[in-house]
């Protein structure tokens, strides 16, 4: 089954329902992670006069990661210059404490400051300050959460990154770029025809995607900052499933210009494609490994869609998935340890994950219409689209499936998520 056929199936299943579009979400966290660090994030002094509640955003980020549990801070009135009474916070059950302030500057910007404390050891773990315009208050909060996450887990936080996704209302399709929590969504492109397969470039400056605006699937790249588009692949037949190489110089794409759907590599600026494999089967949905040496892809060469692997320059093909008769939509974690994919189980499409070193396979959702998994750049969460309780939703999940966050709001056709890379600060 080709990428285009797969995508059209999901469009008919969900995008044909005609719900109103939604551009922002609220975060609803459910489930229990295996290990959660108790942290108190006190209300920031002065944040009542700001348009964003910094402490609430920080706490929501940390809880959504599955590694933190919020501790009640009711009655606390502290800021980053105050040394807290550690005994009080230990009694409340906190292992760490974040304090801060928000001050309006004379030029209209906001000065956001914070400090992190190790309550158990009584140690100052450092802090930062940000002078930001009003529109960047949420970004400042996400960066605070990144700092806290890295200090307490040793892994880089991904809260200040972005996601891309597609919505449909009536006959209007929109490509959106939003914060990793779904807020602050901005429309990047609108079309009366379907938009599918958004894929972030490695440096986060561009999105590749497929548009049907010319009544056939065509691959474009889109500059996120200025909105400029470049036509990449408009060959005879279908052009679909763009995937960036780690160096950003090449796109792997699926083309049917020579007959069946086959894998090609094409310069990221456009040009003549180079065929990667010779096969009479349908090969589609390529994705590069983080080192750029291999490509995972979907093929029906064994009779039904399964995930395979081959060298990125072409060569011998190796089958990867064996559990289940129908496996599609591969996504590789940035650390190279995990493969997420969608498996059809008794007619239901469920998110699965493979630990590549051991080959261990786990189903991590109990929903039945999952699609388009994409890893956070720190490899600790997966974003995907699904239906839950009859509603279309974007979800994030921990890799063990123990804690999920529904990025929910109004009903809407919200699809095709892709998680962007770390941003330069």
Regions found by a protein language model. Give the residues of each.
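Hydrophobic beta-strand positions that form the internal "hydrophobic ladder"
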Residues: 163, 207, 248-252, 292-295, ...
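Structural motif
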Residues: 109-111, 171-176, 216-220, 260-264, ...
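Multi-bladed beta-propeller domains
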Residues: 179-196, 222-240, 266-282, 310-326, ...
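Short loop/turn segments immediately following the C-termini of beta-strands
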Residues: 168, 212, 256, 300, ...
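Short beta-strand->alpha-helix linker/helix-N-cap micro-motif
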Residues: 28-88, 98, 102
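Amphipathic beta-strand/beta-sheet edge segments enriched in Tyr/Trp
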Residues: 25, 82-147
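Residue-level detector of Asp-centered blade-edge/turn motifs that repeat once per structural unit
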Residues: 157-159, 202-203, 246-247, 290-291, ...
């Amino acid at each position: 089954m080709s990428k285009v056929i797969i995508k059209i199936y999901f469009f008919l299943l969900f995008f044909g329902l005609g719900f109103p579009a939604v551009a922002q979400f609220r975060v609803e966290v459910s489930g229990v992670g295996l290990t959660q660090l108790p942290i108190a994030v006190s209300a920031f002094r002065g944040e009542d006069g700001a348009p964003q509640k910094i402490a609430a955003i920080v706490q929501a980020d940390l809880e959504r990661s599955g590694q933190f549990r919020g501790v009640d801070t009711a009655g606390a009135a502290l800021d980053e210059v105050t040394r807290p009474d550690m005994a009080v916070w230990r009694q409340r059950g906190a292992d760490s404490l974040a304090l801060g302030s928000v001050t309006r500057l004379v030029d209209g910007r906001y000065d956001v400051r914070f400090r992190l404390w190790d309550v158990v050891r009584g140690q100052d773990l450092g802090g930062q300050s940000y002078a930001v315009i009003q529109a960047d208050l949420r970004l400042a909060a996400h960066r605070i959460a990144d700092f806290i996450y890295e200090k307490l887990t040793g892994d880089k936080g991904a809260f200040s990154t972005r996601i891309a996704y597609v919505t449909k209302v009536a006959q209007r399709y929109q490509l959106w770029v939003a914060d990793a929590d779904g807020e602050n969504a901005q429309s990047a492109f609108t079309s009366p025809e379907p938009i599918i397969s958004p894929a972030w470039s490695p440096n986060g400056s561009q999105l590749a995607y497929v548009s049907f605006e010319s009544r056939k699937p065509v691959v474009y790249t889109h500059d996120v900052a200025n909105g400029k588009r470049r036509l990449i692949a408009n060959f005879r037949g279908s052009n679909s499933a763009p995937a960036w190489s780690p160096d950003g110089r090449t796109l792997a794409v699926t083309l049917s210009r020579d007959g069946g759907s086959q894998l090609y590599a094409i310069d990221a600026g456009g040009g003549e494609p180079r065929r990667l494999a010779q096969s009479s089967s349908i090969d589609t949905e390529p994705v590069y490994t983080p080192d750029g040496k291999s490509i995972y892809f979907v093929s029906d060469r064994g009779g039904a869609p399964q995930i395979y692997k081959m060298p990125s320059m072409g060569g011998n093909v190796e089958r990867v998935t064996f559990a289940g008769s129908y496996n599609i939509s591969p996504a590789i974690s940035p650390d190279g340890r995990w493969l997420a994919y969608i498996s059809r189980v008794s007619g239901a499409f469920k998110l699965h994950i493979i630990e590549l070193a051991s080959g261990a396979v786990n189903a991590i959702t109990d929903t039945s219409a999952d699609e388009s998994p994409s890893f956070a750049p720190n490899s600790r969460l997966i974003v995907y689209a699904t239906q839950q309780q009859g509603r279309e939703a974007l979800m994030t999940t921990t890799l063990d499936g123990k804690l999920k966050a529904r990025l929910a709001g109004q009903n809407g056709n919200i699809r095709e998520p892709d998680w962007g890379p770390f941003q330069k600060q």
